[in-house]
Amino acid sequence: VWSQLLHVVNTFLYSFTNDYNAIQSNDSDDRIVVWVGSSGIGGRDQMQVLQQMVNDSFTPTYKIDVDVQLVSNGTLLPSALAGVGPDVAIQVENTLPMNYGMRNAVKDLSGFKNFDDVIQRFDQAAVVPYCFRNKVFALPDTYSFPMMFVRLDVMDSLGLKIPKNWNEFKDVVSELKKKNMEAGLPHDFNTFSMMLFQNDISVYEDDGIRVNFDEPRAVKVFEEYTKLFTEYQMQLTYDAVNRFRTGEMPILIADYTLFNHINVFAPEIKGQWTFCAVPETINGNVSNKTVTGTGTATVMMSGCRNAENAWTFMCWWSDTEAQLSFSRRIEAILGKSARYSTANLKAFEQLPWSNDELRAITEQRSFAKGVPEVPGGYMTSRYYNFAFLSVVNSSKNPVEQIRKYAKLIDKELEGKRLEFGIMS
């Protein structure tokens, strides 16, 4: 008892002098600094897992010290430009690597040793947002995509079948409305791009010369998509887990990671629900159930003091063994709801999924596609959202709105290409 009390007192006193943002520090020239964003795997539990893995595996094997630091989001680029950034940053938002790369803030990884082998660890769609004109500015950390969640018991009691395509989905929405019930569908850019992909329409022409939103087929897609929220009156905001748990929303489309939250926070409906591929679009005799994949990434900063050591860390961190170890430890500490959506394919397959769960996720992932990041592309999702809300909230004409904002997006794309000296 006295030894435990002494430990508590010492820990309390030490807390006044310990820097909890820097877990380990070493002045060696070979040392690398790794930043982790606080909204990614940030948090003391997760950081301790990463540091323990570095201490147990990475440093003894490669003789490279690692200073892991927890930082607030939004500090990466300003710090890098000020010359005080890290060597490596992990859990970086997927829209940032290409934009940082165009500003020479992160390194192109494609020329590093064994790059071609390392990149095979991931689904190629997961790499798409980090590439531009044969340059690769990041390695994927996490990767996720939407799936359809269904309350089997509720659907059965209503005499409804799981919809296989969007026409059937609309029919289900109509029937649910008659019972004062709802279906859930996100209205974000990733969902709209999914609709475009299912109609064989790319978001951009070539490598970002222009956006394809005003292409006639894309205009039609936008028009039909917004009808789900105007004519069918689908909700814009809702608590997915709670509405699904109560049965008020017996069918919804959401990121596959919602599976973990439902299992933890709604154990009373175990065995009464499932998840499967999203509805497909049927054009003639051709069906398409493509979804949009997204995630986070690891980057090497341009001001990196020792690129070889930084690359060694990135290879180790993205490898199957490290990703599986990290995933298992995090889940053991924080529970099933924190299951890590690793982008490493082999590590993902070894997580504690059932055969049916793994089969369903793997099938949907095979239809996942990444949205390319292009100079000026940060305005694409913003202007899409403006167009969507103007139709749904202000009853504006969908054709006019999507064409209007497509022109504004094109103007931004053109401006950024001129700024970076990119020839068409």
Question: Where on the chain are the PLM-derived regions?
Answer:
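Long, aromatic- and glycine/proline-rich binding clefts that accommodate carbohydrate-like moieties
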Residues: V278, R328-F386, S390, L418-S424
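Glycine-centered hinge/linker elements that transmit conformational signals in sensory
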Residues: G208-T237, V278
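Hinge/lid segment of periplasmic solute-binding proteins
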Residues: F16, Y20-Q24, N94-M147, L152, ...
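Extracytoplasmic/periplasmic substrate-recognition and gating elements
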Residues: A266-R339, S366-K369, F386-L389
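Conserved N-terminal structural module of periplasmic/extracytoplasmic solute-binding proteins
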Residues: V1-L96, S395, V399-S424
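Extracytoplasmic/periplasmic solute-binding protein
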Residues: F132-F137, D141, P146, N167-V219, ...
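Beta->alpha turn/N-cap motifs
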Residues: S72, Q91-T95, D188, A254-I262, ...
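Short helices/loops that flank or line small-molecule/ion binding pockets
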Residues: G74-V88, R103, V154-M155, D171-L176, ...
